[in-house]
């Protein structure tokens, strides 16, 4: 912003959060524009000023709670969730068997009753299906009828979290091949980037160690879905991306206790 002359960022991300940052910088006095080819142009200015701005709600967290509602046959209202930022997820959620009601205040996500349906999902950059949406959804797909396929095209080796799900009784196999119908850059690079989920399978409680942020929340969803008691270690990793998640779980009447 303060550099002299024109700065050009090519192949830039254009997710809603990035565009929201562009709005903030413009409010602060920046001269910044975004082209349709994902090029961001920034003209240097002498100074930036203060601003007032309401940050976007977290669409990853919203989708995580939606997947939890689907897996547990529950009902949750996510205050502040934006329909326009979650179009691809909402279409997938509905195809699997979830239902949602959009209001000015947020989105209500709930299980519509009956059996969940299997689906093929491929992750992609915005406006595609976010890579951070797939882990929570995989838990819900363990409860769907038939074979579901999730093809990860954004990051390699994102299915490590499925080991704990298999320990709980899920039938999930991971593959190096591209199984979603589209060849991606990981197809010939020996990465496990496709998963086949067979369901429905009852899950049972287990002792789990959280591997990372998104995988960890997915394990919480699995624990809520499972019969019996689960012990999930390393939940401090989840705090990083899910603010006050324990109080939110308690507000949903989840039988959960944090030991440390």
Regions found by a protein language model. Name each.
Residues 1-260:
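Short, structured segments at the rim of ligand-binding sites
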